[in-house]
Amino acid sequence: MGMLEARELLCERDERTLFSGLSFTLNAGEWVQITGSNGAGKTTLLRLLTGLSRPDAGDVLWQGQPLHQVRDSYHQNLLWIGHQPGIKTRLTALENLHFYHRDGDTAQCLEALAQAGLAGFEDIPVNQLSAGQQRRVALARLWLTRATLWILDEPFTAIDVNGVDRLTQRMAQHTEQGGIVILTTHQPLNVAESKIRRISLTQTGAA
């Protein structure tokens, strides 16, 4: 039994089947990239895995239990960052981290922002930051979270090369410590092929 399992997932949109019979099992320490063409259902699959949407058939299980039976404990173990940064634009970068991690002290939040490349921008309202900087505010949570499972939809959008490298290193560290990372990205990952497992939505049912 793996930590996260997709079992015979079916997803249909507008009378079109995005994927069917999709099954896979993820274990501690895995780093997974969901691949497929535009419109293949990559974001849809991520939302199914987070529990934000329900499949038309099939099940998602966490530690052997369907998500709807373990929703609270699952979400305590999950960090989800979607296409939108999901941050409070009227708050500063530092205030945003305090909002999402109320048990984190200021020093930890400042360190997370520095790791994300936002040193010097901590006290600026988010609505005055660039798109890339706003994305970094959301991604700074990667240095604070205690969640085991990270699900990230295009995390490198609007991030420069140095930022991508830093984020990639953080993901590698997380998986080396037994965490799981699932992501979509159009950018090449600067890591050894042996470290990345790819699940293709162009070959559904055989992932």
Swiss-Prot record:
It is found in: Cell inner membrane. InterPro entries: AAA+_ATPase (IPR003593), ABC_transporter-like_ATP-bd (IPR003439), ABC_transporter-like_CS (IPR017871), ABC_transptr_haem_export_CcmA (IPR005895), P-loop_NTPase (IPR027417). GO terms for cellular component: plasma membrane. ATP binds at G36, S37, N38, G39, A40, G41, K42, T43. GO terms for molecular function: ABC-type heme transporter activity; ATP binding; ATP hydrolysis activity. The keyword Cell inner membrane applies. It is a peripheral membrane protein. Keywords: ATP-binding, Cell inner membrane, Cell membrane, Cytochrome c-type biogenesis, Membrane, Nucleotide-binding, Translocase, Transport. It catalyses: heme b(in) + ATP + H2O = heme b(out) + ADP + phosphate + H(+). The keyword Cell membrane applies. The complex is composed of two ATP-binding proteins (CcmA) and two transmembrane proteins (CcmB). Part of the ABC transporter complex CcmAB involved in the biogenesis of c-type cytochromes; once thought to export heme, this seems not to be the case, but its exact role is uncertain. Responsible for energy coupling to the transport system. This is Cytochrome c biogenesis ATP-binding export protein CcmA.
